């Protein structure tokens, strides 16, 4: 299959587009023109490669998780170690690219929204590296869950604005950041943290994140001599997933599996699985799947992981689901905790709760395949930021902890 999306209007099929006030259209058009000109500029590419390599720590390893593979029994499991990047997650791939873009455009200030705080930290990091003024918007509830990341951003010189409106989470932080951008568009570039928002943002973020999949393709061919059978990644807005999926879209023999946050279960209504539990609508400048009521009002979401706790999904994922090129499943909070403990105990790697959703489902898939097959998990971030909240949860819910431990013993003997 030949894949050439988005089209010139910024659509992936019916998804995507630019649903924003007229006042922002010139800024979006200018950004698109500048991006398309700059992205193939030799000097820009050299600079970006330099910082990704020397500063962020690319390429990241594609690590064969031999002990995890043994206890699961089935396909070989590989981990794409985005958790080893500077700042601890895949987010830095995008922020370095976009901050370099900001410099090229000649703007002096950057703003961003953040949920788990990872994108905020990596934006503040890149701003500090290039000497740009930086403001980060964060929902009050997320700021409480991720107090350390709030301090990290301040430490890096960013101003952190806590958003108390609405559900006080990522959706509200995006609203405030968009308001700021409308007001200060002449001096300010908005670095969206995921592959969502109005065109050209989903395309820009995807392009900067696709270094993940490009490396995987090269690495797996060197190790296995063939492409992987399955690639699994967690999906909130979807930037780590689109980053690893995109270079494989035309390789139709490779199964692409996105794992959404099932929260307490889709049937409870307390989840953040937009594709599995949402409907098509418009929010934050794009048409995609959202968790909304029958009148299009956005409903509250729930996930154990702040980074997946967003009521929508990037338009390219909506499209990949529509054309059946990728499949989207869910993992509950409890399943994610199982993945979190399992990887910690088998490989000595504490994963982010976001990535833990992908781990547990990849394990189920690997178990069903024979030993000649391979499954790649995008380990999108490390779990340091989650250790305190997992500790608090398991300290208060002893029954849950016991249940998880006995499940690990029964299923994997660990």
Curated annotation (Swiss-Prot):
Which reaction does this enzyme catalyse, per its entry? (1S,2R)-1-C-(indol-3-yl)glycerol 3-phosphate + L-serine = D-glyceraldehyde 3-phosphate + L-tryptophan + H2O
Protein name as annotated: Tryptophan synthase beta chain
Q: What species is given as this protein's source?
A: Sulfurihydrogenibium sp. (strain YO3AOP1)
One family from Pfam that matches here is PALP
Q: What class of enzyme is it?
A: lyase
Q: What does this protein do?
A: The beta subunit is responsible for the synthesis of L-tryptophan from indole and L-serine.
**Source organism's superkingdom?**
Bacteria
For the keyword Ribonucleoprotein, the answer is no
The major lineage groups are: Bacteria, Pseudomonadati, Aquificota, Aquificia, Aquificales
Report the family membership: Belongs to the TrpB family.
């Amino acid at each position: 299959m030949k894949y050439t999306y988005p089209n010139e209007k910024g659509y992936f099929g019916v998804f995507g587009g630019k649903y924003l006030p007229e006042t922002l259209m010139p800024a979006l058009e200018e950004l698109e023109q500048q991006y398309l000109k700059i992205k193939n500029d030799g000097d820009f590419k050299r600079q970006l490669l330099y910082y990704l390599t020397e500063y962020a720590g690319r390429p990241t390893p594609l690590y064969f998780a031999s002990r995890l593979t043994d206890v699961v029994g089935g396909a070989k499991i590989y981990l794409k170690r985005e958790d080893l990047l500077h700042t601890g997650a895949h987010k830095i791939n995008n922020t370095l690219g976009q901050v370099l873009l900001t410099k090229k455009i000649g703007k002096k200030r950057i703003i961003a929204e953040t949920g788990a705080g990872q994108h905020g930290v990596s934006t503040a990091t890149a701003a500090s590296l290039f000497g740009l003024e930086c403001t980060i918007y964060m929902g009050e509830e997320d700021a409480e869950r991720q107090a350390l990341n709030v301090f990290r951003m301040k430490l890096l010189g960013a101003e952190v604005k806590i958003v108390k409106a609405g559900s006080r989470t990522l959706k509200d932080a995006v609203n405030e950041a968009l308001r700021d951008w409308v007001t200060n568009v002449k001096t300010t570039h908005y670095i969206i943290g995921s592959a969502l928002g109005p065109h050209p943002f989903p395309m820009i973020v995807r392009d900067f994140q696709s270094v993940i999949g490009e490396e995987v393709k090269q690495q797996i061919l060197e190790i296995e001599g063939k492409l992987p059978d399955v690639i699994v990644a967690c999906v909130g807005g979807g930037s780590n997933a689109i980053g690893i999926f995109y270079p494989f879209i035309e390789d139709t023999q490779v199964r692409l599996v996105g794992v959404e946050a099932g929260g307490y279960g889709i049937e409870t209504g307390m989840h953040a699985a937009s594709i599995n539990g949402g409907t098509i609508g418009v929010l934050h400048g794009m048409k995609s799947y959202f968790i909304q009521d029958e009148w299009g009002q956005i409903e509250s979401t729930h996930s154990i992981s702040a980074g997946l706790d967003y009521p929508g999904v990037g338009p390219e994922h909506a499209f990949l689901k529509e054309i059946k090129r990728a499949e989207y499943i869910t993992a509950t909070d409890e399943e994610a905790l199982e993945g979190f403990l399992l990887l910690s105990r088998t490989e000595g790697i504490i994963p982010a709760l976001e990535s833990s959703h992908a781990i547990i489902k990849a394990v189920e898939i690997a178990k069903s395949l024979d030993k000649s097959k391979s499954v790649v998990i995008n380990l999108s971030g490390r779990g340091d930021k989650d250790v305190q909240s997992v500790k608090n949860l398991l300290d208060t819910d002893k029954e849950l902890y016991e249940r998880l431990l006995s499940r690990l013993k029964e299923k994997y003997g660990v």
